[in-house]
């Protein structure tokens, strides 16, 4: 059997000599092999004769590998973090620790069980590998990082290595996301910058471990709702949508609660999602060179380290507010407010879809109540330093203020806040 993982082999004598290991593993293939007898010893496999099974550690630099006797030679197995794909094998001779990490937990447990049997001299039920050098193609299968920066290097006739965690495919003239990429379930970072992608498939949301997605310099015009409601909302930390043609982001975009870094530079955005305040973990926000006219009221709820809104077409706050009050409230408005206030679950399987849209796009008054069809809209000016530690100037005049739209559920709330309005 063979196990792809990262391996660090360190001497047990280092602590007594006052030395530390370099503490970094290398990508390797660990094999449980049949150890040859004295008359069967193969020149390419440096194994101890006479044992039943041996452990062979092969790396890209040493494909023949180094073999270690197992029978009555394991001093201790450290398996506290085996569920995280980590374990350490301490041998008596040579006195080394073989530290395994980034392994498949299930396969690692199988290997450790077989090693225990080999140590006791028992028959190992698991099929044993042969003492032969690991082929280069074998390491290719277990690659965790792949960088492609030209069209000629893009693989057309073969699949991507299944264990990839980081994939970059830039300057490849891709018109769509390659469906083969969506089979890479271990991906944590996907970089498709500098291509010609116009639409994202909803199945990107099936990459449950994806933390960083870079789509800089493509031709995207929209960001779909299914992506916003996929498992990415729990895993995605960094999203780069700069240099595209996006005009608007859906309300559901604010369900990416784990986002810490968002780049929206050089798009055609007229406004930001009005529930942007729900992105409570967001620390770095760039939306420079768009067509933003104002900021949503929930923008005040952000707590950023860095903010760049340079080069937008911010409008001057309007003196006269927009009044759309309905007195008395319609029955529909009252019911919708009650659903939101009491947090009653709703969905298209319970109420009509257009009502779900109304509830999803409800505004919040400064008093905390919800506004749907009945509200007063006013505009205030906000100093961006109140939400960000570092602020890039809004324009060449050196300003750091921007207009913010506020909503009021009643005339009373509007009057109380009138001193904040221009």
Curated annotation (Swiss-Prot):
Recorded metabolic or biological pathway in which this protein acts: Protein modification; protein ubiquitination
InterPro entries on file: Leu-rich_rpt, Leu-rich_rpt_4, Leu-rich_rpt_typical-subtyp, LRR_dom_sf, LRR_domain-containing
Claim: ATP-binding is one of the keywords in the record: no
Record has Cytoplasm as a keyword: no
LRR repeats: 184-207, 209-230, 233-258, 260-279, 280-301, 304-327
Main location: nucleus
Pfam family, one: PH_LRR1
Cellular component, GO annotation: nucleus
Highest taxon listed in the record's lineage: Eukaryota
Record field: transmembrane: none
Keyword annotations: Leucine-rich repeat, Nucleus, Repeat, Ubl conjugation pathway
Cell compartments where the protein resides: Nucleus
Coiled-coil ranges per UniProt: none
Stored Gene3D superfamilies: Ribonuclease Inhibitor (3.80.10.10)
Record-level GO BP terms: protein ubiquitination
Subunit structure: Component of the probable ECS(LRR1) E3 ubiquitin-protein ligase complex which contains CUL2, RBX1, Elongin BC complex and LRR1. Interacts with CUL2, RBX1, ELOB and ELOC.
Function field: Substrate recognition subunit of an ECS (Elongin BC-CUL2/5-SOCS-box protein) E3 ubiquitin-protein ligase complex which mediates the ubiquitination and subsequent proteasomal degradation of target proteins. ECS(LRR1) ubiquitinates MCM7 and promotes CMG replisome disassembly by VCP and chromatin extraction during S-phase. May negatively regulate the 4-1BB-mediated signaling cascades which result in the activation of NK-kappaB and JNK1.
Official protein name in the record: Leucine-rich repeat protein 1
Native source organism of the sequence: Mus musculus (Mouse)
Gene: Lrr1
């Amino acid at each position: 059997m063979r196990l792809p993982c990262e391996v660090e082999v360190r001497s047990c004598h280092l602590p007594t000599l006052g030395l530390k290991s370099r503490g970094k593993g290398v990508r390797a293939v660990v094999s449980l092999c049949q150890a040859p007898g004295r008359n069967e010893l193969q020149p390419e496999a440096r194994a101890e004769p006479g044992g039943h099974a041996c452990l062979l550690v092969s790396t890209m630099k040493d494909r023949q590998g180094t073999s270690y006797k197992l029978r009555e030679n394991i001093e201790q197995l450290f398996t506290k973090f085996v569920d995280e794909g980590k374990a350490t094998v301490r041998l008596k001779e040579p006195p080394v620790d073989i530290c395994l990490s980034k392994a498949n937990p299930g396969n690692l447990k199988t290997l450790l069980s077989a090693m225990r049997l080999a140590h006791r001299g028992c028959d190992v039920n698991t099929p044993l590998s042969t003492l032969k050098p690991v082929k280069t193609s074998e390491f290719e299968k277990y690659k965790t990082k792949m960088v492609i920066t030209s069209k000629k290097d893009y693989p057309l006739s073969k699949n991507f290595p299944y264990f990839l965690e980081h994939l970059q495919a830039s300057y490849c003239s891709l018109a769509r996301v390659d469906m083969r990429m969506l089979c890479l379930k271990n991906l944590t970072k996907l970089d498709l910058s500098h291509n010609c992608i116009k639409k994202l498939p909803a199945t990107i949301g099936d990459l449950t471990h994806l933390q960083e997605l870079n789509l800089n310099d493509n031709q995207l015009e929209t960001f779909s709702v299914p992506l916003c409601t996929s498992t990415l909302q729990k895993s995605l930390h960094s999203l780069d949508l700069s240099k595209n043609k996006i005009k608007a982001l859906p309300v559901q975009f604010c369900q990416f609660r784990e986002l810490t870094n968002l780049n929206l530079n050089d798009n055609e955005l007229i406004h930001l999602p009005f529930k942007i305040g729900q992105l409570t973990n967001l620390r770095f926000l760039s939306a420079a060179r768009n067509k933003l006219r104002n900021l949503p009221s929930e923008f005040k709820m952000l707590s950023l380290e860095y903010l760049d809104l340079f080069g937008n077409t911010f409008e001057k706050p309007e003196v006269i507010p927009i009044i759309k009050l309905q007195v008395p409230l319609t029955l529909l408005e009252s019911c919708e407010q009650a659903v939101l206030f009491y947090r009653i679950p709703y969905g298209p399987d319970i109420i009509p879809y257009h009502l779900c849209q109304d509830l999803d796009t409800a505004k919040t008054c400064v008093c905390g109540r919800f506004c749907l069809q009945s509200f007063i809209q006013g505009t205030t000016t906000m100093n961006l330093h109140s939400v960000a530690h570092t602020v890039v100037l809004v324009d060449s005049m050196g300003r750091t203020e921007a207009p913010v739209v506020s909503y009021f559920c009643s005339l009373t709330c509007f009057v109380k806040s009138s001193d904040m309005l221009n």
